[in-house]
Regions:
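C-terminal and inter-domain tail/linker signature
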Residues: 1-129
C-alpha cells in the first residue's frame, strides 16, 4: 500500500471509529493480529471497548481534529487535537498517535500517551490489561 493509502485508512479510523464511537469498521480497518497499546484484547477487545464506552458513558462525546498526517513506509503518525465531553465536563489536548499498517489494515496502534489521563478528567476510566 502507498503512504497515501495508509494515511486514508488512519484518517477513516479517527474520523469514523473514534469520533463516532463506531465499532462496525473495526474488522475492515484492523488486521486480525491488531495490537493497541492502550486498550487490551486486540481487535476483539477494541470491538468490545467501543460499545462499553457508549453504554457506560452515554454523554461521552469525542471530537478529534487531525492537524497533520505524516507517513513513511508502513507507519503513519497523526497529530490530533482531542476534545472530550462527558456529563458536563470537558477536556482538550493535542498529541501524537502512531500507527503501523500492513496490507491496508492497522496492525499496531500507539495511542497518545495522555489519552487515559484526558479521559479521566471527564470521568472515564479505561480498563487495564
Amino acid at each position: 500500500m502507498s503512504t497515501e493509502q495508509n494515511k486514508a485508512v488512519v484518517r477513516r479510523f479517527i474520523e469514523r471509529t473514534l469520533n463516532d464511537l463506531d465499532a462496525t469498521l473495526v474488522d475492515e480497518l484492523f488486521a486480525p493480529d491488531y495490537v493497541n497499546h492502550l486498550v487490551p484484547g486486540g481487535r476483539e477487545g477494541f470491538k468490545q471497548f467501543v460499545p462499553m464506552l457508549r453504554s457506560a458513558f452515554p454523554d461521552l462525546k469525542f471530537h478529534n481534529s487531525i492537524e497533520h498526517l505524516i507517513a513513511e513506509g508502513d507507519h503513519v503518525v497523526a497529530r490530533i487535537t482531542f476534545h472530550f465531553t462527558n456529563a458536563g465536563k470537558e477536556a482538550t489536548a493535542s498529541d501524537l498517535a502512531e500507527f503501523r499498517l500492513a496490507n491496508g489494515k492497522i496492525v499496531e496502534d500507539w495511542p497518545p500517551s495522555g489519552t487515559a489521563a484526558l479521559l479521566q478528567q471527564v470521568g472515564v476510566t479505561l480498563p487495564s490489561g
